[in-house]
Amino acid sequence: MLSYRNLLIWVSFWIFLGLFLFTAGGRLFYPYQLEWMEGETLVYLARLWEGRPFYISPTLEWTPFLYNFLYFYICCALDFFIGDGFIAGRLVSIVSILATVYLLFLIVRDWCGEVIYGVLAAALFLATYVPSGAWMDLARVDSLFIFFITLA
């Protein structure tokens, strides 16, 4: 039997997860930039497809961000199957955040010894989506970075 507190935590988790999936799913196929740096992801993917290097000395044509290239290679692999646009980058970010939520659940559950605390940690992380600027589903390296930091 669930206590009132545990029921409230579970309901909160499912509400926050549903809101995240609803919002991220609605923004996944939006054909334009949701944020000013999202367009740079497409520029990086174009450079990958053309076989041009990322990390060169800054010029007027190209000044690279100091981001790890792994995200762009993953997006490029997805881009091969999905097609051009923001979908591949946003999909990588959404999957990364969902994997982070699952990792948070596992870490806190194992550390505290109770499932409900893992659910609470996952719910609190999902609750930060809007207050943190709704960046978790953008075609940017940040979500994959958060996943790898949590995994470490």
Q: Where do the protein language model's features map onto the residues?
A:
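Start-transfer (signal-anchor) and selected internal transmembrane alpha helices
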Residues: 1-24, 109-110, 115-116
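Helix-to-loop transition at the C-terminal end of transmembrane segments
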Residues: 19-39
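Extracytosolic helix-loop segments that constitute the early lumenal/periplasmic catalytic or substrate-binding loops
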Residues: 22, 39-63, 70
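Juxtamembrane segments of multi-pass membrane glycosylation machinery
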Residues: 50-52, 70-95
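Transmembrane-helix motifs of polytopic, lipid-linked glycan transferases
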Residues: 91-112, 151
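Transmembrane-helix signature of polytopic, membrane-embedded enzymes
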Residues: 102-127, 146
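Specific aromatic-rich, kink-prone transmembrane helix
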Residues: 124, 131, 144-152
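Short acidic/glycine- and proline-prone juxtamembrane loop motifs at membrane-interface regions
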Residues: 134-142
